[in-house]
Amino acid sequence: HRSRVLRYLELYIFPHIGLSDIRQLKTSHLLAPIKKVDASGKHDVAQRLQQRVTAIMRYAVQNDYIDSNPASDMAGALSTTKARHYPALPSSRFPEFLARLAAYRGRVMTRIAVELSLLTFVRSSELRFARWDEFDFDKSLWRIPAKREEIKGVRYSYRGMKMKEEHIVPLSWQAMILLDQLKQISGDKELLFPGDHDATKVMSENTVNSALRAMGYDTKTEVCGHGFRTMARGALGESGLWSDDAIERQLSHSERNNVRAAYIHTSEHLDERRLMVQWWADYLEKNTVDYITPYDFAKRQV
């Protein structure tokens, strides 16, 4: 992590102000190289640079190198990144999708990755970098840590939870069967999904989307791996069975309302989420036979 921060500074900041006297730096001096990065479309990089530069200047204030922090006034100067919308299939196309998935003849590990993505609807990095020691097979639980040990040479492999706190994912019996199958393949390794040619690395970030393309889908307009989260969110909401808090907790979404966020955080909704992920798996299974809406499937179970 430290080397990555230094690399960003060397690339984008030092060429502009690296030789400057820190006591002479103004907000505009700090902001100029960061805005240049922002204007190039690298909004996330620009946001991280702003955070790092602000932290460095804060350290300088705390250690009496400068009297005040000129970086504090950079707030609000960068583009706000719009939420990205990922393509996802409507529930009416679930039977078609599940039939294509059943007919998929690629690697078994890849098929399992697609199915687990669909059943758990976690983020791509949360699944790709998963370790076997995160799973409790007796309780059918997956504990995704806030941060993982970095895999040398694998970009972003330190990623655990996006919200920087442990996330407990209850697992359906269908997901547990897949994990048992996967254990026959990679159970002797640390990672669930080791790389093709090097078991110390992980499967490519494009694996799930490549499988979807092999199944005949356009991952830019029809469905992509991240779109499974949208598909699950839509069906769970349409069923009318589950509270928004439980759904949002399962998706590990952040809550902008601080009071509500504190409530959701302290209340894991684990019992409801256990029932919910099992309902989702059963609903998908039902759609392998014929299409039924989430609402109608929910009514049959009440």
Please give the residue ranges for each predicted region.
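Short, basic (Lys/Arg/His-rich) helix/loop patches that form interaction surfaces
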Residues: 99-111, 120, 181-200, 206-249, ...
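Conserved tyrosine-mediated DNA breakage-rejoining catalytic core shared by Y-recombinases
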Residues: 72-79, 129-184, 255-258
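Basic/aromatic-enriched alpha-helical hairpins
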Residues: 1-40, 56-59, 258
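N-terminal DNA-binding module of tyrosine recombinases/phage integrases
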Residues: 1-22, 267, 271, 275-281, ...
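Hydrophobic (often cysteine-bearing) scaffold residues that line and stabilize catalytic clefts
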Residues: 1, 5, 9, 26, ...
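C-terminal catalytic core of Y-nucleophile DNA break-rejoin enzymes
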Residues: 83, 87, 151-180, 189-211, ...
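Basic, Lys/Arg- and aromatic-enriched nucleic-acid-binding interface segment
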Residues: 37-52, 62-130, 138, 148-150, ...
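Catalytic-site neighborhood detector that most strongly recognizes the C-terminal catalytic loop/helix
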Residues: 80, 88, 144-152, 176, ...
